[in-house]
Amino acid sequence: MAGGVKGIGKFFGDVVAEMKRVSWPTRKELTRYTLVVLGTVAFITVFFAVVDYGISALVRGLIE
């Protein structure tokens, strides 16, 4: 059991060491990346909404 506790401590120590080596984006880069993601999500949302509406209208037209 003691080996497990030491293993957990080593794991978190390794995590901290790895996080220090990470190349974090600047605030400007982070803002740009966030806007790209939000824009992409908005575009895909609108695209699928239009496709869904079109398919629904087509099916409604076939049913009636």
Swiss-Prot record:
Membrane topology: Single-pass membrane protein
Subunit structure comment from the entry: Component of the Sec protein translocase complex. Heterotrimer consisting of SecY, SecE and SecG subunits. The heterotrimers can form oligomers, although 1 heterotrimer is thought to be able to translocate proteins. Interacts with the ribosome. Interacts with SecDF, and other proteins may be involved. Interacts with SecA.
HAMAP family, per the entry: SecE
Annotated protein name in UniProt: Protein translocase subunit SecE
Molecular function, one GO term: protein transmembrane transporter activity
Pfam families the record matches: SecE
Upper classification of the organism: Bacteria, Bacillati, Bacillota, Bacilli, Bacillales
Subcellular location: Cell membrane
Keyword annotations of the record: Cell membrane, Membrane, Protein transport, Translocation, Transmembrane, Transmembrane helix, Transport
